[in-house]
């Protein structure tokens, strides 16, 4: 198992979190939601990979590498990263990687290039009629210092919804 990289300098992260990448503010806590890619925000991607590896190792998973970043994060038409940023703490609270079904590319055999492709045998009907209207979400994480034992990875949802939740399933 390799050591996890040190945190990325906050000035580098802030420089890449530009207004063009800002989706909106959260409903609570004055946090900000951004959408980035490894190509337009390489330092943010490194920090995402670091935080994912920290969180996943804590729960007995992880890649064993210095960061949790794979080919789906870095390929030409890479998955996008939705992150919650705390301007007050100047750090990433958590995030998801995602790909809209309408943006899915296909390999030379017509198979969708998705992180989950090895798990399913997608029918032609599914690919044509359903896939374009889906979103593949994955690699969700909440930075350890922002996790609660009650909400876990669902804490990102709760951060942005003003309704009081006792539990989510």
Regions found by a protein language model. Give the residues of each.
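Conserved N-terminal entry element of GNAT/NAT acetyltransferase domains
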Residues: 2-39
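Context-gated lysine
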Residues: 14, 19-21, 28-30, 105, ...
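A conserved beta-strand-loop-helix scaffold within acyl/acetyltransferase catalytic domains
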Residues: 34-149
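Conserved short hydrophobic patches within well-ordered secondary structure
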Residues: 48, 162-163
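Conserved acetyl-CoA pyrophosphate-binding loop and the N-cap/start of the following alpha-helix
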Residues: 150-162
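Conserved small/polar residues in nucleotide/adenosyl-binding loops
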Residues: 166-169
